[in-house]
Structures are given as structure tokens and as C-alpha cells.
């Protein structure tokens, strides 16, 4: 166990609750002490939805510790069943309440005798997996549960649809731009003449799950959530799945070609090449932009990428392949899936970092001094501290990355959005000069206020004057190098002479 003030992936119960609260008319009961119940607040604050978060905490308090939990948990399940009439109630412990080692499956079976809806225990090892793994496992478990139930009742629908159709897996609450991605994928499938059979779990009813085998194939746009459910359906019904993330022009085309191959293997005869060509050359602005003079200004610029596997790998490829940007470091916090990430990005970047320690990532960014960072909310904080611009490309994210406007990341419109994000994240060279020339008499003073607040170093008047003569777009780097030079030599007052000496040392 370690104390952290920042976690990239939360504990397992958060993943289970994200899946349960993504479905329509599914309620979750969390068996937990009061400190673990922050999910409701987090989701209510971040997700722009009108409905209350369908999660109830069955609080583990001193009475429960004295008498055992069964009575309270069963009572909470049956009460919520009577009040809300959900189709399914999911019971989940947290890592804290798991210490009690109670037989929760027994509680579920006991509650099921009285409840009208279905009751299920989320079968997740809270000490071994994180939020993303638990979400993937819980989604698979719910799909399995309803396929088995339909089979038992004899109403499982296995007959394929007449036209090619798809199930889209992995869109969840609190996901990165998931709502917009779902809309864009529906549009893309419609353009390809493919019917959307179901989008699971976001907004889906559990009653739809018995019809999942009707689709011709499953699409899993995010590596973190949905893969286990797609693998289960492949084993049970021989349903193929496509797990190529359609982020960026190149990967979107690769995903569409894979879809073409999958549905042609089932008797269709489609050719999506004209569609890919039309979208790439004329409809999407991304390919045109990457050949423009604006993009050539970015060639060779240095960047650091960090996020979940899906988005970090996709952005690394876009930066390196489509925009000619030099990726110094590509990183992920999904340590459990390290091999896949390394295989995806190693040829597109100088170095790969797999870690969930935000301090390690911050140190790497400070050491490398990239022109821009593409990361999570945490990297945004790091960028602000180091005065390096940052584009947010992956969860965990704060409220500004749950946009009201339409901002997908997948498909051809997603490619346009990503191009804007990348281009606007780099500081343009002339910007600082123009600010200095036209910004009024106090501009230089404002710009040099970035001298470290917690610094043990003092800049003399002549040192600051010399620093202000340096062009704005490299001033931050020169300042940091000079301060490092001074610290290494135990110099506390930085004069113009120290600045010259530091420049010579770096030059040498």
C-alpha cells in the first residue's frame, strides 16, 4: 500500500460503479465505509447528466462490525428494488470492506428471494486489479449473466440481422469524450451502411443484451474496456471483433479495412476504399493540414505523451507519423498491459515509460523539457508548473474535458479535433516577441515573474536584465539551465556573469 495524492486509475470498485451507472435502469449498492463513497459526488460533478447517480452506499459502521453485514445489505437491496424498480442491482464491496471477508454471494442469493429485479455480485479481486480492469471484468460479467439467463429462458436471439450490423463496446460514464465518440462512431457506421445493434454499456438496457449475438461483429474502440466481453462473445457465438482504435487518419482507415474484411468474410460484398479515399483527401481537414505550411512549422518539435494505453498509443502514432513531431517519451499508466503498449509505440518514440507514479512522469518531463505535453489532467498541472503547454488526451480528466460542444476523438471528425488540439498546444515562436513589443511597459516584468516561487536562488538586476534580452520562446529553458548550473556550484546570486558561464557550459 502507498499513500498517493494522485491516482491515474482508481480502485476496483470505481470501475464496477462506472459500468453499472452507465447502463439504463441498473442500480449499484456499494458495501463500504463512508470514506469510499466519493463516486456519487465525482460523477454528479463531472458528467453533464440530468439523472442522479444510481449508486447507494450500504455503510459499514460500528453496528455492522459488531453484528455482521448481512441484515443491512439485504435490507438495502430489497428497499432499493422496491423504490426504484431497477432491472438489475449490482452489489460491490470496496478494498476496505473486503477485509471483512464476508460471503457477499450469500447476501445476493438471500436478497434475490425477495427482489423482483435481478441481483448480482461484481466478482472482482479488489486487491489485484484497478479501476480499468474491474470495469472490463464487470462488463463481461453482466453480458455473461444475461446471455446465460436468456439461454435458460429460451429467448436468446442468435439469428443474424439482414444487413451488416455491429455492437459497440466500451462507452462508459466518466470516460474520455465517450459520449461524443459514440455519436461519431454511429455516424461512421451509418456512412458504411452498417446498422448499430447495440452500444454497451452507455445508455443500454440489460434487456438488449440477449440480442447481442444478432450483430455481424463487435467493435471495441478502447483497449481498456470491452475487450473481455468481446472475447466472451467470440468464444460463445464465434462472433468476430475489431479492436483497432479509429483515432487518427491512418488508424481510422486501418479499422475500416478490418471491418470490410470481417463482413465480407460473412457473405457481404463491400468495398470501402472509395469512402476512405474521399474522407481522407476531401472531407477530413487533417490530411490536408499535415501537408500545409502550418504543420511544417511543427516538424521536429519535441513532445511527451502520457495517458491510458488507447489514447497514448494513438496520439504517439499521430504525432510521429502524420505530423512529423519528435516524440521524446511515450508513457502509459496501464502497467498490466505493458507488452501491448511497448509493441505499439516503440518505433515511434525515443523512450517508453510505464508507470503510475505521477512524480516519475513529472521528473521525466522536467528533464526532457519538451515543447508540448499531451497527457492527463495531472500532466496539465505539471505543464503549468514548468510553463510547458499541455493538451489533455486521456482520462483522468477534470470538468473542462467534459465539453458541452461536439468534440469526438475517433473517426474523421475526431482527427480534425486532434489536429486543432496538437497545433494549439504548441506555443508559436512569434507570440512572445509580439507580447513584448506591443504588450505595454510592464510586460517584461510580468514575464520574468515566472522565476521559481520556491527557489532558493536570487537573480540580480543585471542578471534579470540579461535574461530579458533572450527571445521569449527559449527564455524559460535558459532560465532553468542557469538555475541548475548555479545550484550545482552552490551559487545563490545569479548575475549576468553566471548566466554567461551557464550558457558556455551548456554550449560546451
From Swiss-Prot:
Cofactor (UniProt): [4Fe-4S] cluster
One Pfam family this sequence matches: PCP_red
GO biological process: light-independent chlorophyll biosynthetic process; photosynthesis, dark reaction
Catalysed transformations (reactions): chlorophyllide a + oxidized 2[4Fe-4S]-[ferredoxin] + 2 ADP + 2 phosphate = protochlorophyllide a + reduced 2[4Fe-4S]-[ferredoxin] + 2 ATP + 2 H2O
Positions that bind substrate: 429-430
Enzyme Commission number(s) of this protein: 1.3.7.7
Keywords, alphabetical: 4Fe-4S, ATP-binding, Chlorophyll biosynthesis, Iron, Iron-sulfur, Metal-binding, Nucleotide-binding, Oxidoreductase, Photosynthesis
Protein name as annotated: Light-independent protochlorophyllide reductase subunit B
Family: Belongs to the ChlB/BchB/BchZ family.
Function: Component of the dark-operative protochlorophyllide reductase (DPOR) that uses Mg-ATP and reduced ferredoxin to reduce ring D of protochlorophyllide (Pchlide) to form chlorophyllide a (Chlide). This reaction is light-independent. The NB-protein (ChlN-ChlB) is the catalytic component of the complex.
Active site positions: 294
Molecular function per GO: 4 iron, 4 sulfur cluster binding; ATP binding; metal ion binding; oxidoreductase activity, acting on iron-sulfur proteins as donors; oxidoreductase activity, acting on the CH-CH group of donors, iron-sulfur protein as acceptor
Subunit: Protochlorophyllide reductase is composed of three subunits; ChlL, ChlN and ChlB. Forms a heterotetramer of two ChlB and two ChlN subunits.
Bound cofactor: record note: Binds 1 [4Fe-4S] cluster per heterodimer. The cluster is bound at the heterodimer interface by residues from both subunits.
SUPFAM superfamilies, sorted: Helical backbone' metal receptor
Main enzyme class: oxidoreductase
The keyword Iron appears for this protein: yes
Gene giving rise to this polypeptide: chlB
Knockout-associated phenotype: Cells lacking this gere are unable to synthesize chlorophyll, accumulating protochlorophyllide in darkness while synthesizing chlorophyll normally in the light.
Organism field: Leptolyngbya boryana
Database matches in Gene3D superfamilies: 1.20.89.20, Nitrogenase molybdenum iron protein domain, Proto-chlorophyllide reductase 57 kD subunit B
Amino acid at each position: 500500500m502507498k499513500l498517493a495524492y494522485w491516482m491515474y486509475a482508481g480502485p476496483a470498485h470505481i470501475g464496477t460503479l462506472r459500468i453499472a451507472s452507465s447502463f439504463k435502469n441498473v442500480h449499484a449498492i456499494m458495501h463500504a465505509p463512508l470514506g469510499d463513497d466519493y463516486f456519487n459526488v465525482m460523477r454528479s460533478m463531472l458528467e453533464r447528466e440530468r439523472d442522479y447517480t444510481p449508486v447507494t452506499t450500504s455503510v459499514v459502521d460500528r453496528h455492522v462490525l459488531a453484528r455482521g453485514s448481512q441484515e443491512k445489505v439485504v435490507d438495502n437491496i430489497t428497499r432499493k428494488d422496491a423504490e426504484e424498480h431497477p432491472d438489475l442491482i449490482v452489489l460491490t464491496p470496496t478494498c476496505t470492506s473486503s477485509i471483512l471477508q464476508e460471503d457477499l454471494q450469500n447476501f445476493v442469493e438471500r436478497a434475490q428471494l425477495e427482489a423482483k429485479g435481478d441481483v448480482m455480485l461484481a466478482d472482482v479481486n479488489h486487491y489485484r486489479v484497478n479501476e480499468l480492469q474491474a470495469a472490463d471484468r464487470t462488463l463481461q460479467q453482466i453480458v455473461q449473466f444475461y446471455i446465460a439467463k436468456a439461454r435458460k429462458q429460451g429467448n436468446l436471439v442468435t439469428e443474424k440481422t439482414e444487413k451488416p450490423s455491429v455492437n459497440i463496446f466500451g462507452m462508459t460514464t466518466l470516460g474520455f469524450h465517450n459520449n461524443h465518440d459514440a455519436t461519431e462512431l454511429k455516424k461512421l457506421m451509418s456512412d458504411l451502411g452498417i446498422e448499430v445493434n447495440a452500444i454497451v454499456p452507455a445508455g443500454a438496457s440489460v434487456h438488449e443484451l440477449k440480442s447481442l449475438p444478432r450483430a455481424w461483429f463487435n467493435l471495441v474502440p478502447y483497449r481498456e474496456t470491452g475487450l473481455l466481453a468481446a472475447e466472451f462473445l467470440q468464444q460463445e457465438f464465434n462472433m468476430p471483433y475489431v479492436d483497432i482504435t479509429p483515432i487518427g487518419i491512418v488508424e481510422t482507415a486501418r479499422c475500416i479495412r478490418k471491418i470490410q474484411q470481417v463482413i465480407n468474410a460473412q457473405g457481404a460484398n463491400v468495398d470501402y476504399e472509395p469512402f476512405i479515399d474521399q474522407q481522407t483527401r476531401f472531407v477530413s481537414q487533417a490530411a490536408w493540414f499535415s501537408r500545409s505550411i502550418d504543420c511544417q512549422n511543427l516538424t521536429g518539435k519535441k513532445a511527451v505523451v502520457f495517458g491510458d494505453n488507447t489514447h497514448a498509443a494513438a496520439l504517439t502514432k499521430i504525432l510521429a507519423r502524420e505530423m512529423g513531431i519528435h516524440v521524446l517519451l511515450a508513457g502509459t499508466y496501464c502497467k498490466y498491459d505493458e507488452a501491448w503498449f511497448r509493441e505499439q509505440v516503440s518505433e515511434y518514440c525515443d523512450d517508453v515509460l510505464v508507470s503510475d507514479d505521477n512524480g516519475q512522469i513529472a521528473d521525466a518531463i522536467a528533464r526532457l523539457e519538451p515543447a508540448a505535453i499531451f497527457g492527463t489532467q495531472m500532466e496539465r498541472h505539471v505543464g503549468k508548473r514548468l510553463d510547458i503547454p499541455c493538451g489533455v488526451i486521456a482520462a483522468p480528466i477534470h470538468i473542462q474535458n467534459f465539453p458541452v460542444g461536439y468534440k469526438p476523438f475517433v473517426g474523421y471528425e475526431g482527427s480534425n479535433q486532434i489536429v486543432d488540439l496538437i497545433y494549439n498546444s504548441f506555443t508559436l515562436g512569434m507570440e512572445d516577441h509580439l507580447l513584448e513589443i506591443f504588450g505595454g511597459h510592464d510586460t517584461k516584468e510580468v514575464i520574468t515573474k515566472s522565476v521559481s516561487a520556491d527557489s532558493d536562488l536570487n537573480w540580480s538586476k543585471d542578471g534579470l536584465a540579461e535574461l530579458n534580452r533572450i527571445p521569449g520562446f527559449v527564455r524559460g529553458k535558459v532560465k532553468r539551465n542557469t538555475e541548475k548550473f548555479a545550484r550545482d556550484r552552490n551559487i545563490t546570486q545569479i548575475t549576468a556573469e553566471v548566466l554567461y558561464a551557464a550558457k558556455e557550459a551548456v554550449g560546451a
